[in-house]
């Protein structure tokens, strides 16, 4: 079989990230991040979700929509290795794949019935940009999907280090309270590209309608400005 049926977009995610910069590198790293999955009109059928509420977590199969036009590469530079070492694309989760498909496990917080949008899935811990197309949704099965003795290869050897976040109270007050823990969690993950280590450089990250400017010196990330975007 040389061809497969065309994939259908079943939903899109609504998240606090209008751009790629700042998105956690894996799902579940910042559980405080809230998002919503809105189905396309032809899939707003409550019966299609029957039984899903019994699962605490779900798998999202999605499209790297920003990488579709970029092609693929047999080797890539994983951020975990500082962006300097090449690994095979199939040993990584790089978006630059023959088929630019992503896979994320997220917590299912509930299903909201919306008059216009139909059933909407409320999730936590997603690592997706706002508007990302969702190709499929499957339940997470602990007895089959969890492997406590699994080896993480080079990713296990290079565990991420959390930064200490210095967020001046006057600036934190500009962030709506419902977004504060999530924003601090994202900043603690060090949003910078792995090859950026200049302590004098100022970075800007769009999040939840805000533009957050910061710098990193050593293991401390200092927030410098919070502006309405």
List each model region and its residues.
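Conserved positions in beta-strands of structured domains
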Residues: 14, 106-109
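Mixed-charge, low-complexity intrinsically disordered regions
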Residues: 1-101, 113-122, 126-229
């Amino acid at each position: 079989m040389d061809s497969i049926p065309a994939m259908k977009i079943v939903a899109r995610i609504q998240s606090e990230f209008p751009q790629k910069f700042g998105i956690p590198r894996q799902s579940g790293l910042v559980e405080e991040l809230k998002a919503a999955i809105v189905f396309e009109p032809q899939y707003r059928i409550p019966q299609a979700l029957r039984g899903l509420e019994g699962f605490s977590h779900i798998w999202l199969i999605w499209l790297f929509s920003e990488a579709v036009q970029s092609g693929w590469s047999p080797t890539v530079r994983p951020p975990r290795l500082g962006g300097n070492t090449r690994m095979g694309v199939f040993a990584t989760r790089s978006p630059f794949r023959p088929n630019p498909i992503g896979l994320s496990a997220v917590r299912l917080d509930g299903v909201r019935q919306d008059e216009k949008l139909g059933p909407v899935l409320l999730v936590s811990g997603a690592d997706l940009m706002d508007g990302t197309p969702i190709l499929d949704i499957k339940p997470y099965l602990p007895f089959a999907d969890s492997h406590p003795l699994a080896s993480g290869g080079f990713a296990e050897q290079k565990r991420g280090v959390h930064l200490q976040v210095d967020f001046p109270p006057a600036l934190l007050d500009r962030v709506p309270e419902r977004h504060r823990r999530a924003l601090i969690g994202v900043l603690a993950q060090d949003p910078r590209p792995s090859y950026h280590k200049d302590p004098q450089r100022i970075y800007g990250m769009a999040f939840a309608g805000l533009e957050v400017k910061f710098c990193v010196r050593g293991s401390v990330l200092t927030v410098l400005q919070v502006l309405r975007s």
